[in-house]
């Protein structure tokens, strides 16, 4: 019964698309109309395990909480750095910049995150193939640009990293004294896995929360005169990836380009879903930061645990999320040390994601503030770390 109703709805929508090409529900841009999508996509479900699937198959897998790389156009990722050993990257034994970081932590404002997230979730969807996704990306780019301008960050820059599907990724760069680079990431797109091109996807938690969390961390990081003047030992980048929900497409494109360019990325942290704590509290568990332990760099992950202990007001919990579960996996595949933190033990994470109900009202900005503290503490410590 449900399938027949959905088919009727889908058919009616297609008719409406033909009859009313300017209807706001029709999410493909005119400029994208000539893009020819393949009938099937090549996905990687685990190392070496690939499968050809349709787009509907992709969404069906995601509804079953099965993650993957879409490698249809990214088969070269990891082929150049496959012999690169991330074990050679050594992280500090403990945080060493407490005196500089603690005053900065006091500058983080959850009100800023709320204000940004209210606008970011007001787009009907941020689906990467939609004009809404392109518009939300343009809005976010402007917020990042304004953040740099307001800080007087004349040495810093921000650019759109274009993709053929229309929604650009965003990269903000704060040059340091070397090309060794520390990356902080989140994904900007959202999706409704039932009918991505039609249904609303506010994406407050997934990953609007991570998007505004790292934006606020960037704002406060730029209050450091040393960072602002380019005196950090290492270059800092903040990334907002497009099309994570489609199979880590945006981050794959970026890290494939970095791999080809020989970029020296020393660390990458992904902040994906930073705001939901209710299931944790309902289970009688303490509010905590979920530190992912599978398919991540152990040294970087160990250092992140120390950062949480020193700079956050809540503990961490160790948890797992599986293969290709967020954009850090693209960095890892390219041969770069990567890590991932999430709002809780994975079993208590937000089950409203990928639906119309992924709304601000279910989130805790106090919890997001803890993720911002983690982000700020980590990026500052690693910006001044003495990597070989």
From Swiss-Prot:
Gene3D superfamilies: Zn peptidases. Residues 20-88 form a propeptide. One of its GO terms (biological process) is proteolysis. InterPro entries: M28_fam, Peptidase_M28. GO terms for molecular function: aminopeptidase activity; metal ion binding; metalloexopeptidase activity. It is found in: Secreted. CDD domains: M28_AAP. Its main location: secreted. GO terms for cellular component: extracellular region. Zn(2+) 1 binds at residues 187, 206, 272. Belongs to the peptidase M28 family. M28E subfamily. Extracellular aminopeptidase that allows assimilation of proteinaceous substrates. Monomer. This is Leucine aminopeptidase 1. The gene is LAP1.
